[in-house]
């Protein structure tokens, strides 16, 4: 009797039919498998070379492209691994890509991935709420890739003569002096 009590304390994924929503676990796994269609974003050659040494991004994309084994626990583990990889992205951004537009898109990805993780941990899994998050994560990744392209495009625009002087004269924050405001 004690052995059975100890054995039942383990946290196992219980595969029961989702009778509330009328869907079996086999059907749920088929739905998850059909929605897991992550693809690496298309890059220009300039972006590809700029991101070539960013190991965390490449590992995350490679991990997403591989479908998990056909079990709920495999999907849960895959999304949990994805969360860990996403957390390291802002700290490891390559030089030149550390701007607010890219960071905000990474933060959006950091919002959608934990929500997907939470939904996959529920029992029964609310598949109608879960499935849209696969598309949202793919859109977030595409949006980040588009921002990479925009950064490279802006960097390649040549500066015209006198443009730097205009920027400096217009930028009042740079011209402001600490002692300019009188103190009384």
Positions of the model-derived regions?
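Charged, amphipathic alpha-helical oligomerization/scaffolding segments
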Residues: 52, 56-59, 81-84, 88, ...
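C-terminal amphipathic alpha-helix
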Residues: 27-43, 47, 124-184
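Short, charged, amphipathic alpha-helical segments
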Residues: 76-80, 100-107, 128-136
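C-terminal motif of bacterial Sec signal peptides marking the signal peptidase cleavage site
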Residues: 4-8
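Immediate post-signal-peptide N-terminus of mature secreted/exported proteins
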Residues: 11-77
């Amino acid at each position: 009797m004690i052995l059975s009590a100890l054995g039942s304390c383990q946290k196992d994924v219980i595969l029961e039919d989702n009778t509330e929503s009328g869907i079996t676990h086999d059907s749920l796994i088929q739905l998850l498998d059909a929605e897991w269609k992550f693809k690496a974003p298309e890059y220009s050659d300039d972006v590809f070379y700029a991101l070539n040494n960013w190991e965390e991004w490449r590992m995350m994309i490679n991990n997403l492209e591989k479908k998990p084994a056909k079990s709920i626990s495999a999907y849960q583990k895959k999304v949990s691994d994805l969360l860990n990889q996403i957390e390291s992205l802002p700290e490891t951004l390559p030089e030149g890509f550390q701007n607010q537009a890219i960071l905000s898109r990474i933060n959006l990805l950091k919002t959608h991935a934990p929500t997907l993780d939470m939904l996959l941990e529920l029992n029964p899994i609310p598949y109608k709420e879960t499935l849209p998050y696969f598309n949202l994560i793919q859109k977030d990744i595409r949006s980040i890739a588009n921002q990479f392209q925009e950064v490279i495009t802006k960097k390649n625009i040549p500066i015209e003569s006198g443009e730097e002087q205009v920027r400096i004269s217009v930028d009042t924050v740079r011209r402001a002096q600490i002692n300019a405001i009188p103190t009384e």
